[in-house]
């Protein structure tokens, strides 16, 4: 794992849905920028994912409550533009 204070260099908003956007949506719903920040904060090496789809299955928020996600897509088209894509 890299430095514990990795900061994004830029941010943009998603334009259309993809599997990457779906997972970013799930991390951001739980209060994290992306998988990089989640792994830094929670000190985990693996994120629980659905084997069939590869989507994030379960995330632990900063207040230690859990978010559980379905196998299917959860990010509706009307929510896609709210997803932020961070570049490091």
Curated annotation (Swiss-Prot):
Keywords: Differentiation, Spermatogenesis. GO terms for cellular component: cytosol; manchette; nucleus. Disulfide bonds: none annotated. The keyword Repressor does not apply. Essential for spermiogenesis. Belongs to the MEIG1 family. This is Meiosis expressed gene 1 protein homolog. The gene is MEIG1.
């Amino acid at each position: 794992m890299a430095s514990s204070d990795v900061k994004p260099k830029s941010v943009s908003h998603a334009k259309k849905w993809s599997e990457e956007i779906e997972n970013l949506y799930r991390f951001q719903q739980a209060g994290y920028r992306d998988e990089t920040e989640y792994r830094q904060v929670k000190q985990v090496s693996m994120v629980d994912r659905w084997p069939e789809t590869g989507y994030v299955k379960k995330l632990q928020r900063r207040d230690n409550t859990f978010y559980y996600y379905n196998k299917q897509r959860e990010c509706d088209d009307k929510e896609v533009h709210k997803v932020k894509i961070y570049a490091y």
